[in-house]
From Swiss-Prot:
Stored Pfam families: Ribosomal_L5, Ribosomal_L5_C
Record family assignment: Belongs to the universal ribosomal protein uL5 family.
Protein name: Large ribosomal subunit protein uL5
PANTHER family referenced in this protein's UniProt entry, alphabetically: 60S RIBOSOMAL PROTEIN L11-RELATED
SUPFAM superfamilies registered for this protein in UniProt: RL5-like
Oligomeric and partner information: Part of the 50S ribosomal subunit; part of the 5S rRNA/L5/L18/L25 subcomplex. Contacts the 5S rRNA and the P site tRNA. Forms a bridge to the 30S subunit in the 70S ribosome.
Gene designation: rplE
Keywords per UniProt: Ribonucleoprotein, Ribosomal protein, RNA-binding, rRNA-binding, tRNA-binding
Cellular component terms (Gene Ontology): ribonucleoprotein complex; ribosome
GO-annotated biological processes: translation
Role this protein plays: This is one of the proteins that bind and probably mediate the attachment of the 5S RNA into the large ribosomal subunit, where it forms part of the central protuberance. In the 70S ribosome it contacts protein S13 of the 30S subunit (bridge B1b), connecting the 2 subunits; this bridge is implicated in subunit movement. Contacts the P site tRNA; the 5S rRNA and some of its associated proteins might help stabilize positioning of ribosome-bound tRNAs.
MF annotations from Gene Ontology: rRNA binding; structural constituent of ribosome; tRNA binding
């Protein structure tokens, strides 16, 4: 079991229950899933780029990504409905906790010119979204084998009802929020 999951069960649950006055531990917010998304717009002209992006995503997440397809045709972007234009991975359970641990402890500190994550990137329902400009911050990606530097979106979906609860949950995991 991931250390972060043990820490959540032993310390964070009690801390948040006390802070927000929950009657049962089932009311305490928890992380439900982490979604990684990589849009590869250049895949229209070169299919190899999407394969490389999917391989990077598989290395980062530890599971095979789902290839996302265009929902409708857009002439301005030269895409048709059904064209593969990106990939995504949804992490739950043990893989989710392991990824979150790697993200907080290893990857986020490796971001260039890092001054903390934006504390206002919550969606109003306690879910947090962040963008990463370079996939090379993850230790699983070998810098020499990267064909192109790509970014990805990371969404942490929680069971929190408000942004305040979600922020308290992530802050309990020592998320490096900007002051």
């Amino acid at each position: 079991m991931a250390k972060l999951h043990d820490y959540y069960k032993s310390d964070v649950v009690n801390e948040l229950a006390k802070q927000f006055g929950y009657k049962t531990i089932m009311q305490v917010p928890r992380i439900e899933k982490i979604t990684l998304n990589m849009g590869v717009g250049e895949a229209i002209s070169d299919k190899k780029l999407l394969e490389n992006a999917a391989a990077d995503m598989a290395a980062i997440s530890g599971q095979k990504p789902l290839i996302t397809k265009a929902r409708k045709s857009v002439a301005g972007f030269k895409i048709r409905e059904g064209y593969p234009i990106g990939c995504k991975v949804t992490l739950r359970g043990e893989r989710m906790w392991e990824f979150l641990e790697r993200l907080i402890c290893i990857s986020v500190p490796r971001i260039r010119d890092f001054r903390g994550l934006n504390a206002k990137a919550f969606d109003g329902r306690g879910n947090y979204s962040m963008g990463v400009r370079e996939q090379i911050i993850f230790p699983e990606i070998d810098y020499d084998k990267v064909d192109r530097v790509r970014g990805l979106d990371i969404t942490i979906t929680t069971s929190a009802n408000t942004d305040e609860e979600g922020r308290a949950l992530l802050a309990a995991f020592n998320f490096p929020f900007r002051k």
